[in-house]
């Protein structure tokens, strides 16, 4: 089987024997499963795919690697600060001197890796370049800087928020989320006692805002960094909510009085409507009769058609030409 993604195509042409290596933050590419090894990823769908093939999976942000690995390959993410966190985390998790390769696309900023490695005191050499990607090689070392240093705390909407590189809206309040918060009192009334699910929770701002007003909140996100950020945000604001990884409703059970969301529509640099469409189409099954879905989206996105198909009708609660807040109610039967 041939590699599908450009970074994996570059790796495929190497003479390196990657058997039993650790793949870190990899893309979906079936070629990796033919090579073997283990995976360390914050993406729930990546972890699920590797578990389905019986491969070792590390899903924690600070895993304990029980067996040594001959080397690791880090797939450089589009968020540079997140890539730097992975470097710190790998140096903390792996024995000193473990071979570490970094691969990524030029348009994703992989060439900036050289400066990041130099700043950490890690030597580096260029191994190969093709398919508009570059592969670098270095070795892990004991570093003075901890991965914990990547976390950011800031204030917004009367809340204390914890955020991490790679999490949506990192370090600031997104304009769409701000608009959604402004209309939530109209949409939900008094949230006290309501069971509310935040899908695509990011740093947990929606759940925290509802939780401090008495709602029973739960939050899910595909990304382990977002789940960790949400848990920290809940703790910082005294909210007794739950947060866990889930691909939309994949690991959600039970019914809710309301579902709130600022759903993603990008996968890396490409537009991907899949998660938002699933959210809308599957929401009625997760709502009690009379329960409501309240979400914000860029005005150009095709959500009205999906809302009509799933709920029959919907209401626009706010529209500033950039963002729209939609509300749809599950009919009582």
Curated annotation (Swiss-Prot):
Keywords: Cytoplasm, Methyltransferase, rRNA processing, S-adenosyl-L-methionine, Transferase
Reactions the enzyme catalyzes: guanosine(1207) in 16S rRNA + S-adenosyl-L-methionine = N(2)-methylguanosine(1207) in 16S rRNA + S-adenosyl-L-homocysteine + H(+)
One cellular component term from this protein's GO annotations in UniProt: cytoplasm
Recorded GO MF terms: 16S rRNA (guanine(1207)-N(2))-methyltransferase activity; nucleic acid binding
InterPro entries registered for this protein in UniProt: DNA_methylase_N6_adenine_CS, Mtase_sm_N, rRNA_ssu_MeTfrase_C, RsmC/RlmG, SAM-dependent_MTases_sf, Small_mtfrase_dom
Annotated EC: 2.1.1.172
Entries under Pfam families matching the protein: MTS (PF05175), MTS_N (PF08468)
Compartments where located: Cytoplasm
This protein's record includes keyword Oxidoreductase: no
Entry function: Specifically methylates the guanine in position 1207 of 16S rRNA in the 30S particle.
HAMAP family given in the database record: 16SrRNA_methyltr_C
Family: Belongs to the methyltransferase superfamily. RsmC family.
Protein name as annotated: Ribosomal RNA small subunit methyltransferase C
Gene this protein is translated from: rsmC
